[in-house]
């Protein structure tokens, strides 16, 4: 029986490349001349450091554009609240890895509500979809892509 897995992962190499490109762009931008601002990548999260909160917003936009250039979906970003220590502002941006249980339940409910003849089961941080016809599986892929679940999804381990 054909099956595939729905996963949500961000490639660490592409993420690091996007952060490096964003740091390079910061050093060349006119509005960041003479300003201490940087992106620090560590363990699937990026720490933004700047002197003003509006610069943090600009830095998030720079990071988003560089992620898009590297084919990393910016919807995987989850920005924490900005905090100020002295003259500098800090903000941590975490990248979602894996599908959380409540999002996985929404995916399974979305598939079952659409009455496609497939079975969806939650297996850890991924959702396995099994069906008799390849066309049904492709319909589920289109359904999950169109569903607004606040997280990017990839399809892996397609078996015929």
Curated annotation (Swiss-Prot):
Keywords: Nucleotide-binding
Record bears the keyword Nucleotide-binding: yes
GO molecular function, one term: nucleotide binding
InterPro entries reported for this sequence: DUF520 (IPR007551), UPF0234-like_C (IPR035571), UPF0234_N (IPR035570), YajQ-like_sf (IPR036183)
Intrachain disulfide bonds: none
Any one of the GO CC terms: cytosol
Recorded family membership: Belongs to the YajQ family.
Protein name, as recorded: Nucleotide-binding protein VS_1405
């Amino acid at each position: 029986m054909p099956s595939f897995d729905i996963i949500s992962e961000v490639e660490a190499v592409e993420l690091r490349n996007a952060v490096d490109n964003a740091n390079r762009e910061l050093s060349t931008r006119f509005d960041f001349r003479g300003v201490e601002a940087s992106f620090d990548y560590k363990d699937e999260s990026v720490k933004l450091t700047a002197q003003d909160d509006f610069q943090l917003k600009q830095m998030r936009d720079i990071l988003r554009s560089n992620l898009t250039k590297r084919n990393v979906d910016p919807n995987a970003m989850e920005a924490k609240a900005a905090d100020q220590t002295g003259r500098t502002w800090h903000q941590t941006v975490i990248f979602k890895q894996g599908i959380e249980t409540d999002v996985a339940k929404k995916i399974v409910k979305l598939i079952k509500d659409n009455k496609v003849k497939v079975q969806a089961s939650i297996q850890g941080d991924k959702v396995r979809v099994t069906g008799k016809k390849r066309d049904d599986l492709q319909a589920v892929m289109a359904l999950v892509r169109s569903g607004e679940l606040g997280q990017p999804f990839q399809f892996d381990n397609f078996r015929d």
